[in-house]
């Protein structure tokens, strides 16, 4: 009986540590989305309210995603859980884009589906990597931080240097699509190579 109570206490402590990561997970996810949202909401549309609304929605979405991530990592082997998170985040994100925002292939054929899927996958995958305590992921975390800094600087320079109009619009749309695709590839390749 004492063994059972000790086991339950240990499980409770471990579970508590997991849930203490939730605020960091949400914060990193919101920051991951922030540059892309800034580009679309503010630099293209000039709509600060949309940026704020997106950040609030993303925080709520990430809270739910954290629960799903936690469950997947308890049920599946680590790499399988990670890949399941990537796929589910991309698919769920496309669901948000299609049914809540109106960026479906039939409603907005010009919307970049692959870029949107990568954006939503990164929204979950980047914080998943950041909150992971595995020391083998430290180099990947540094690469993500450097990439984020370079990407943000490039976006700000583009906004400052390019004239308003079509060039600036195209720059922001394509840097979001390509930027989040590259970030997703960096995350998936780095995680699968380093995590055990």
Predicted regions and their residues:
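Aromatic-rich, lipid-facing transmembrane alpha helices and their immediate juxtamembrane interface loops
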Residues: 1-196
């Amino acid at each position: 009986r004492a063994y059972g109570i000790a086991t339950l206490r240990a499980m409770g402590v471990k579970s508590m540590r997991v849930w203490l990561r939730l605020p960091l997970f949400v914060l990193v996810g919101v920051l991951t989305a922030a540059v892309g949202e800034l580009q679309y909401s503010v630099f293209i549309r000039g709509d600060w309210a949309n940026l704020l609304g997106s950040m609030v929605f993303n925080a709520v979405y990430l809270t739910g995603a954290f629960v799903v991530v936690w469950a997947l990592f308890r049920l599946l082997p680590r790499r399988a859980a990670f890949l399941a998170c990537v796929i589910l985040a991309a698919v769920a994100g496309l669901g948000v884009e299609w049914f809540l925002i109106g960026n479906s292939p039939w409603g907005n054929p010009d919307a970049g589906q692959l870029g949107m899927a990568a954006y939503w996958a990164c929204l979950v995958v980047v914080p998943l990597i950041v909150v992971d305590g595995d020391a083998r992921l430290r180099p990947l975390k540094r690469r993500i931080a450097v990439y984020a800094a370079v990407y943000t600087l490039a976006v700000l320079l583009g906004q400052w240097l390019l004239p308003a109009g079509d060039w600036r619009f195209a720059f922001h749309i394509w840097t979001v699509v390509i930027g989040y695709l590259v970030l997703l590839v960096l995350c998936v390749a780095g995680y699968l190579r380093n995590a055990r």
